[in-house]
Amino acid sequence: MSWRSESIWIEFIVGSRKTSNFCWAFILFFGSLGFLLVGTSSYLGRNLISLFPSQQIVFFPQGIVMSFYGIAGLFISSYLWCTIFWNVGSGYDRFDRKEGIVCIFRWGFPGKNRRIFLRFLMKDIQSIRIEVKEGIYARRVLYMEIRGQGAVPLTRTDENLTPREIEQKAAELAYFLRVPIEVF
């Protein structure tokens, strides 16, 4: 999603609140909870889940392994839920032609660097760069090349844009910023 006028272009970034992250967090939470309950019921010798009789699963080694997988899954699930709650990676890119400033803002993990704010002068932008890696896991990433500071990514690596979409986005941005496009 983006907003545009003659002199300002604001590109909003989604971050970790994507449908796929919600699905993985739910699947991981309930799957690991099931593993932990089966491991615990094999230890107690009572049926905590009616699907599996506890006599069929011996605590050593199956119950211990299932309990370990359940605990590990709950930790990973809680990490996913925290990134969704904190909305890590979301933010915006603001290109202001009138003031000659580019601002890039992202939310990070809580702590000292929770707010990531980068500010550049438009005259320091050398080019808009498209990096393409073909293969089974094709990857197309849009970068902004800054004089003296290297390349700043403008799209996520997991954002699966088609070649036409990435070219369109790069062309519009390069036209707006009045800089050339490079393809690698």
From Swiss-Prot:
One Pfam family named in its UniProt record: Ycf4
What are the annotated GO cellular component locations? chloroplast thylakoid membrane; photosystem I
Which residues are the signal sequence here? none
Regarding the membrane, this protein is recorded as: Multi-pass membrane protein
Name by which UniProt lists this protein: Photosystem I assembly protein Ycf4
Q: What is its main location?
A: plastid
- Output the HAMAP family linked to this UniProt entry: Ycf4
Q: List the disulfide bonds.
A: none
| Known function | Seems to be required for the assembly of the photosystem I complex.
> Which residue ranges does UniProt annotate as crossing the membrane?
22-42, 57-77
